[in-house]
């Protein structure tokens, strides 16, 4: 059997068909669902869920306890801090199916999302934007290089490519 060009911990699951780039590492208790595409040189921490059809760019770092639900797309070199949250329905209800109401979330190249931040679905986060830990992003567009923080998140300043 040919050795895979990526690492998957023995407790993690990767459903087929999916695509995992060379040099990527998928750690303990993580689950990559079918039709997911994960770029080269990514690192998915413990207990990460990558939903059906999710796209993750090259060099992305997803820390532990993050769920990337269907409709999430992460550009190259995005950082997702521990336990940050992406939603996929605006007003979920247990007894009402809302799968036809999923709203996509796009995160641009080099953006950083802090620990425990919440990104409400339907949001586009610009390239190199920085979402502070614990922030709740509810606006539809976060500009490139914006520094966002608070509940709800507001622009606090500007960042550079280098932080």
Q: Which role fits each region the language model picked out?
A:
Residues 1-7, 13, 46, 55, ...:
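Glycine-rich hexapeptide-repeat left-handed beta-helix
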Residues 1-35, 41, 86:
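Extended, small-residue-rich solenoid/repeat segments and analogous flexible loops
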């Amino acid at each position: 059997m040919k050795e895979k060009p990526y690492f998957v911990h023995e407790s993690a699951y990767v459903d087929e068909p999916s695509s995992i780039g060379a040099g990527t590492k998928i750690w303990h208790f993580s689950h990559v669902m079918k039709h997911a595409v994960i770029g080269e040189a990514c690192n998915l921490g413990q207990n990460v869920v990558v939903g059906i059809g999710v796209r993750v760019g090259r060099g992305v770092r997803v820390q532990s306890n993050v769920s990337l639900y269907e409709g999430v797309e992460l550009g190259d070199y995005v950082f997702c801090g521990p336990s940050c949250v992406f939603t996929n329905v605006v007003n979920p209800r247990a007894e009402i199916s809302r799968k036809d109401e999923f709203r996509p979330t796009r995160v641009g190249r080099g953006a950083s999302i802090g620990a425990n931040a919440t990104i409400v679905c339907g949001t586009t986060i610009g390239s190199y934007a920085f979402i502070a830990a614990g922030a709740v992003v509810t606006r539809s567009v976060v500009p490139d290089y914006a520094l966002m923080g608070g509940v709800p998140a507001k622009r606090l300043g500007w960042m550079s490519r280098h932080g």
